[in-house]
Amino acid sequence: MNKKKVALLFGGRSSEHEISVISARSIANALDKTKYKIQPIYITKAGKWLGAEASRKILAMDFESAIKSPTKKEIHLIEKEIVLLCQNSQFRFDFRTAKIDVAFPVLHGPYGEDGTVQGLLEMFDVAYVGSGVLASAITMDKAVAKICFEHAGLQVGEYLAFLRREFEENRGSVVARAEKKLRYPMFVKPANMGSSVGISKAHNRNELIEAIELALAYDRKFLIEKAINAREMEVAVLGNDEPIASAVGEVVPCNEFYDYDAKYVKGSSEVIIPAQISEAFAGKLKAAALNAFVAADCEGMARVDFLVEKETNEIYINEINSIPGFTSISMYPKLFAQVGISYTELINRLIELALERYSERKLRKI
């Protein structure tokens, strides 16, 4: 049996770099070795692509323990090792001559989850796992995604979106508009980041200004959202034109909200799968997740995050992650495991979906 060659793209020019490496390592370990052969391709924080030998060495590094270190000493040691590998590694790679059957981008955040790598793979004429250029770009930009969700009839929380220029030219006006429409407490987010990077909760004007300045360190666009007293629910979606939804999960954060530290560093947030809700209410969340998936033109996979108001049970869609995490604690594989789809089977299906979509595209007249 000829094994299909899978190019595993990981790392990348994003603040979610380490999470990408951890996700890729989990996928590499779970991949069905009887069907697939891995070609790892590591992308440095500077954007340099490394060959298979260096990439395998990086894939074996213990990033998971390193990011939990309070001193960050371990992560600095890993970064030094990577610098040495970069000095001795030359990347000369042609997807066609390498006979890559499918690429699996495990790149979280900008320059990987936003349509950039997807466009590159389209130009190379390579099948790849996950959403295409349009859906990746839509779901990466939280402001654009909210417009898409509202058009599809989904409820989003009250928010305002601003550009850096607006804040720099008249910060007083930005703050006044937020205070008038949203009132405290509020959340401030970069428009184009994931893993809750750059997100802050503001309880007063000084905190709001600080939160905006933090968000602008990551993006030229930011959102200010009205805080909702809510439970955090998540639904995973799998498929192309006929997607299916997973069980519903709930996250109970160890911090005031589910930020980067609560997700990956402290690791003490509680995950409840399935969520303790009625079957009828779970059905509403699943239907909303599928609606959002289709509205954004997603393919392959996505994790849809919701806020459920504690007193009224009103459902608000928060965001879609087109390349959800695949770490040992990530919700996406756990949610499908609850409905009988193992981690390895999930990866098999994602690769099959990518190849199906590629075959369908080759039939088009272009």
UniProtKB/Swiss-Prot annotation:
Mg(2+) 1 binds at D305, E319. Gene3D superfamilies: 3.40.50.20, ATP-grasp fold, A domain (3.30.1490.20), ATP-grasp fold, B domain (3.30.470.20). GO terms for molecular function: ATP binding; D-alanine-D-alanine ligase activity; metal ion binding. ATP binds at residues 179-234. PROSITE patterns: ATP_GRASP, DALA_DALA_LIGASE_1, DALA_DALA_LIGASE_2. Pathway: Cell wall biogenesis; peptidoglycan biosynthesis. It comes from the Bacteria. Binds 2 magnesium or manganese ions per subunit. It is an enzyme of class 6 (ligase). This is D-alanine--D-alanine ligase. The gene is ddl.
